Each structure stands twice: as C-alpha cells, then as structure tokens.
Regions:
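Catalytic cores and adjacent flexible loops of soluble metabolic enzymes
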Residues: 3-382
Length: 382
C-alpha cells in the first residue's frame, strides 16, 4: 500500500509538470485588492517613483561581522535604498543528507556541502543585533529574508519594516501566511514559478488581510542566463496584478537590471560584495561598489528618464527646431505675381518658412512680393 501511495504521488508530479502550462493558462485569477503602491520604510514603491535599489548582502559577509559592516558602509556610499541579509535556523534550509550540492568554495581546506555552508554563514543573535544596530546608525534601511517561521518571529523582535521571501519559498504557503500576518509589506521573489504558483501565493497572502505585496521577477539560476531572463514578464505581472513589480537579478553585470528599469521595474535587488574574487557561493555574480553606484545613479534618474509617456516637443528641442527643422524656401529669385512651382521652390532648413506639409496648398499660388533665392517662403508672401 505504501508503494502504491508513493507511486500515486509520482503520478501527480508527472501530471503536474506535463500540464503546468495548461494550468498556467486556464487558472482563474481573482481580481485583487492589493495596493498598487507600497511604502517600504520612508520610500514609496510604484509607477512614477524612482526605482528602489536593494543591496543583497545575503551570505557575502562570509561569517564576518566586520565584512558585514563594510558591506553596510559601501551600500550607504552607493546610496542604495536598503541592504538585505538572510535569516534562518540551524539545519533548517536544506537536508543534511544532501551530498551532491557542494559549492566551489573551501573552508579550512575542506569541501563543504550546502547544509554545512549555511550553518557556517548563519547569523546568530549577536550578529543580527550588531548589524541591525549598525545599519540604523548609518541611516540605511536594513531587513532580511526569513527562511522559516521562527526567523519571522525573531525578525519581528528586531522591528524590521518589511520582509522578502525567496523564490525557493514561493510555494511555502505557511511562511507566506506567517509574514502576511505581521501586517508588514512583503517582497516575494518568483523564480521557478508560473502564474498558477504565483496566484496560490498571492491568494494565501491576501487571506491575512495584508494588502502590501511586491513581486520580483527572477530567474533562479546562478549566474543567470540572459537568454532566459524573459524581462517582459515584469509587465505581464504588473498588468495582471496591478501591484509593484521588480527584478531579483543574478546576472553577473548590471546590464539586465538597467534594461528592466527601462521597461518599468519598480525595484531591483542585486547581490552585493566587496570583491567578486572572495570565496563564497554568490560573490562572482554580485556587484562591487563601483558597479552598484552606477546602477543606483541610473535608478535615481529613471523617473525623469522614462518620463510621462506623452509624446510632446521637449523644451530643449525648440532651439533645434529653429536651427534645423525644414521649411519651404525659394530655389531662385521669385518675382512678385509669379506662381509657385516645383521649379522655383524647395525644402530645406532651418525653420522660418511654411512647413513642408503645406507644399501642395501653395503650388500654383502667386507671390505677393518678390522673394530672393534661399529665403524662406511665409504665408504673408502669398
């Protein structure tokens, strides 16, 4: 009976994978009542606001409070909006039995498996308190990704203003529910998901009465393959849910982040390191301070760069109109009473005469005065 039970579970998984796309297309999406702008600390996230930049310190502190403080200092210098770490209980993220998930890093000359690495880089109570206190003194928003419910309780004691849930927990509805019940905003990463999975997470979140949700489009591969980034999904999620959407970027450079800002991403999360050459699982795909500074500079100007969407003549263009835009000119000297023809008029710059779109209206009309060659033809001269 146990064998049959497990075989039935396998069959469900096979059918789920086989028909995932069909489920993705057919699943009814309930009209939501989530906020289309969300306040993170003292910043508002949404359309018509500057893109919010999160420096994801993650595990890049390498277990050192000193390095963590340096990451905070550099994030402040880069003018990032927030810095994020990761919080989890010992032996809680992955099974200790996993033998084939080694990272290409060494500790004291020994290869570590994933669980051992997480345990080594886990933030204890003292570590948490010191970096949270330090960041707040430096006037930068600090928060964390909880990977289990106990960590949510702990972060509540540290009075975080909002939460991030990682892509691996997008299917962890109990954790989503736990964060939702805090009443604080949630940033949810959506790597390894489709609309069906995202919809399940959102509906669970909404049951708590919390209306402050931000989605991050994400490609959960490390480093990310640019051909699989599918950045258009950012606007797909925006159009479906009418909430802020951004990008959790695992691409080695900032090019993908810049492109996502260009198509309207409201928030960018990028891994942050002091040195890409440090040993550790995420350093190589992280941004160093100089690169992060460039991203922040672009993001801060993104609102004015993207503009209103209205196609208008900008103030700086009027001078160019006067000096370069074309109008109708006399090709040769034209006598008073002479008819305008294609032989005696032409189109050239600068502006000052009749616009070329009216040329058919003036052909055959007579000049009301003499016009010298290479002078503009105006309505008063007809």
């Amino acid at each position: 009976s146990q064998i049959l039970f497990h075989k039935s579970i396998d069959l469900v998984n096979i059918l789920t994978n086989k028909y995932a796309q069909r489920d993705n297309e057919k699943k009814e999406i309930v009209i939501n009542n989530l906020n289309n702008c969300v306040k993170l600390g003292n910043k508002i996230i949404g359309d018509n606001y500057p893109t919010y930049i999160i420096a994801e310190a993650g595990l890049n502190h390498n277990g050192s409070i000193n390095i963590a403080k340096q990451l905070i200092d550099r994030a402040v210098e880069c003018k990032c909006n927030a810095i994020k770490f990761q919080s989890f209980e010992k032996n809680s993220r992955v099974s200790s039995k996993v033998k084939n998930a080694n990272y290409a890093e060494k500790a004291d000359g020994l290869q570590e498996n994933t669980n051992e690495m997480f345990n080594r880089l886990r933030l204890n109570d003292n570590f948490h308190k010191k970096i949270f206190s330090y960041a707040r003194k430096k006037k930068i928003e600090i928060f964390s990704t909880p990977f289990d419910e106990k960590s949510v309780d702990y972060l509540e004691k540290l009075k975080v203003n909002f939460y991030k849930i990682a892509s691996v927990d997008a299917v962890n509805l109990p954790l989503i529910r736990k964060v939702g019940k805090t009443g604080k905003p949630l940033i949810l990463s959506t790597g390894m998901t489709n609309i069906s999975i995202i919809e399940d997470a959102i509906q669970e979140f909404k049951k708590t009465g919390n209306k402050n949700l931000i989605l991050l489009h994400c490609l959960s591969s490390y480093p990310a393959n640019e051909r699989e980034m599918n950045l258009k999904a950012i606007n797909t999620l925006k159009n479906i849910y009418n909430i802020p959407v951004g990008l959790s970027d695992h691409f080695p450079g900032i090019e993908i982040s810049l492109m996502s800002i260009g198509i309207g991403a409201n928030i960018i999360e990028r891994h942050f390191t002091l040195d890409k050459n440090f040993e550790g699982p995420d350093h190589m795909l992280s941004s160093e301070p100089l690169e992060m500074k460039k991203l922040v500079h672009f993001a801060n100007g993104s609102n004015s760069i993207l503009g209103t969407g209205q196609k208008i003549i900008q103030p700086s263009e009027y001078e160019v109109i006067n000096s370069q835009r074309k109008s109708i000119y006399a090709k040769r000297n034209i006598k008073k009473g002479e008819k305008f023809t294609k032989k005696n008029i032409c189109i050239k710059g600068p502006a000052g005469g009749i616009m070329p779109k009216y040329i058919d209206m003036i052909l055959g009309k007579k000049a009301s005065e003499s016009i010298k060659s290479d002078f503009p033809i105006t309505w008063s001269k007809m």
